[in-house]
């Protein structure tokens, strides 16, 4: 669990902002959203496969646009 020590004469809003930033970097909110509901193993595999396909399409489209300008 990330922790933030409030400095002397530091407003609470600044400490809260630092805490939120630390939590975001640690990926805590994304992890809790992911674990909020049970996901069947088949659904998890399906989601990961779809993400891989999407990643590959994005990667290949980037490569194609880079290759066009060979002048």
From Swiss-Prot:
One of its GO terms (cellular component) is ribosome. GO terms for biological process: translation. Keywords: Ribonucleoprotein, Ribosomal protein. This is Small ribosomal subunit protein bS21. PANTHER family: MITOCHONDRIAL 28S RIBOSOMAL PROTEIN S21, SMALL RIBOSOMAL SUBUNIT PROTEIN BS21. GO terms for molecular function: structural constituent of ribosome. It comes from Xylella fastidiosa (strain Temecula1 / ATCC 700964). PROSITE patterns: RIBOSOMAL_S21. Belongs to the bacterial ribosomal protein bS21 family. The keyword Coiled coil does not apply. Pfam families: Ribosomal_S21 (PF01165).
């Amino acid at each position: 669990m990330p922790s933030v020590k409030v400095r002397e004469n530091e407003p609470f809003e600044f400490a809260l902002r630092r805490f939120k930033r630390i939590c975001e970097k640690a990926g805590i909110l994304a992890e809790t959203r992911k674990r909020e509901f049970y996901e069947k193993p088949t659904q998890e595999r399906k989601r990961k496969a779809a993400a891989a396909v999407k990643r590959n399409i994005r990667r290949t489209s980037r490569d194609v646009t880079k290759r066009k300008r060979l002048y």
